[in-house]
Regions:
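Q-loop/switch helix immediately C-terminal to the Walker
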Residues: 122-133
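Conserved ABC ATPase "signature" region
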Residues: 136-157, 209
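A short, proline-enriched helix->beta-strand linker immediately N-terminal to the Walker B motif
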Residues: 180-184
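Conserved ABC ATPase signature
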Residues: 161-165, 169
Length: 283
């Protein structure tokens, strides 16, 4: 997926709910399509609406960050996309054109709590292979697990157990599991939020490389504005109660991006300020 660095650095535009999704013929196909999505939860005070009138499309090979204040429903929206939370009446959610009815084929959720998502009694390669078991042959499982570990730089740690790996390496195992399943949709919930600064930047660049080489569609929840601008093609900002998408910001920075050079660009700083203003305006 290429980005035209000659375009303006900070542009925005919501696709109207009535506008047809793009479907090939030189345009990016829509992997995930949401219209009028709402979510209600039970609380001590009765039913409470968390999300309302969410309209969004995730396009083939796109990396989209979802931001907003704590409690605005960012994780809830990801869980809707992977079929773990049922949206309210009138909601339309499709993945690859198919209405969502449970976890969709080809979608993988990457959690912030990497330690809890890996099985400590399984080796790294067997953790990566977990989602493939019973679906493909043993030979294909081995090939796909090996290829995924190679892609995230962990081929030499295939026989290790997760508890022997650093936090950053464990998070790479989660990413490899998604790659092994040939995921068309990676749903990442603050995957680097619990890591130290150096490991975090390293994994940001690892994700950028994997995204460039394999082109999965990625929806990425983060509270880190710099991270969102650095990684994303677009940033969606949730605000309000119940939350809606209050802003959509296109990130037209050249790729591949560099932790120092990119973040020194005037365009990066303009985007950073714009995202900050969009979030803090939700009072």
């Amino acid at each position: 997926m290429t980005v035209d660095s000659g375009m303006p650095a900070a542009t925005a535009g919501r696709r109207p709910a009535s506008e047809p999704a793009e479907t090939g013929d030189g345009r990016d196909a829509v992997v995930c399509h949401c219209r009028n999505v709402s979510v209600d939860f039970d609380s001590s005070e009765g039913r409470r609406r968390v999300l309302e009138a969410i309209d969004m499309d995730l396009h083939e090979g796109e990396l989209v960050s979802i931001m907003g204040r704590s409690g605005t429903g960012k994780t809830t929206l990801l869980r809707v996309l992977c079929g773990l939370v049922e949206p309210g009446p009138g909601s339309v959610v499709t993945v690859r054109g198919q209405p969502l009815a449970g976890p969709p084929e080809g979608a993988v959720f990457v959690f912030q709590n990497y330690a809890a998502s890996l099985l400590p009694w399984r080796t790294v390669e067997r953790n990566v292979a977990l989602g493939l078991e019973g679906k493909v042959s043993q030979e294909e499982i081995r090939e796909r697990a090996a290829g995924a570990l190679e892609a995230v730089g962990l081929a030499e740690r295939a026989k290790d157990y997760p508890w022997r790996l650093s936090g950053g390496m464990q998070q790479r195992v989660q990413l490899a599991r998604g790659l092994a399943m040939d995921a068309c949709l990676l749903l990442m919930d603050e995957p680097f939020g619990a890591l130290d600064a150096m490991t975090k930047t390293s994994l940001q660049d690892e994700l950028q490389r994997v995204h460039r080489e394999r082109e999965p569609t990625v929806a990425f929840v983060t509270h880190d504005i710099d991270e969102a601008v650095y990684l994303s093609d677009r940033i969606l900002v949730l605000s309000g109660s119940p939350a809606t998408i209050s802003d959509e910001i296109t990130v037209d920075l050249p790729r591949p991006r560099d932790q120092l050079a990119t973040k020194e660009l005037p365009e990066f700083l303009q985007l950073r300020r714009r995202v900050y203003d969009a979030i803090v305006s939700d009072r």
